[in-house]
Amino acid sequence: MTEPTPAVPETDDLAEPRLVIEPGVAARFCAVAEPVLMAMGYRLVRIKVSGDAGCTVQIMAERPDGTMLIDDCEAASRALSPVLDVADPIDRAYRLEISSPGIDRPLVRRSDFARYAGHLVKIEMAVPHQGRKRYRGLLDGVEGDAVRVQREGATKDEDPLVLLPMHDIGDARLVLTDELIAESMRRGKQAERDLKQSLGLAPEPPPHAKRSDPKKSHAPKRGPKAAKAPTKPKPQNTKQHRLAADKARRGEIDTSEGD
């Protein structure tokens, strides 16, 4: 099976630090997984270790453009499994899951808050801001080291716009809406087309589809030319014609003409 080949991203895109760092066991998995993912052209989003029904280690990853296809997850899993087996960051058996961040994804980098401006977000502060720990509203981008949010439920006496310091954010996540679903589907389809194109798997156009020739003009074709009306023969002006005209003016008749 051919490995997916993400578009080569800028180094700064891959190296952009996360705002949220996991503690404990998750931090040990992060130290092993992040360099491997980065070498493959992916970014680590979040690692979650769950003890429900056995131990599950969920690693969220993405391309720098925010997408992550099934083929990407499979490739990352094959690369990470042997490395984690050697590093042995946990002293018990666990099940490894590699996934995309999902539609209602966590926002873990500064670029995430800029990319998803205009969408609904919910934020929980690690350090209370203006006496509040939870905020929900429309994401309005970033300003300096703060996140701009048009807060829901603000009273007439309150300014709905709040600036939340990034370093004080404990958890930030998009809220599922129709607009967010539509944008996520659009991003996913574009990423799939790009992947197929990079692997040379783009389907050929159907036989009846005509390829456009860039050398030819794309101006609308003109209809059939109308038939030209018959033209009268050009009048002749020989010496014989001039003599006949003079006789006609003088009232003379040429006896050589006619019956």
Swiss-Prot record:
Region called Disordered, residue ranges: 198-259
Subcellular location: Cytoplasm
Presence of the UniProt keyword Cytoplasm in the record: yes
Ranges of biased composition (kind: Basic and acidic residues): 243-253
Main location: cytoplasm
Example GO BP: ribosomal small subunit assembly
Annotated keywords: Cytoplasm, Ribosome biogenesis
HAMAP family: RimP (MF_01077)
Functional description taken from the UniProt entry: Required for maturation of 30S ribosomal subunits.
Name recorded for this polypeptide: Ribosome maturation factor RimP
Organism: Rhodopseudomonas palustris (strain TIE-1)
Source organism phylogeny: Bacteria, Pseudomonadati, Pseudomonadota, Alphaproteobacteria, Hyphomicrobiales
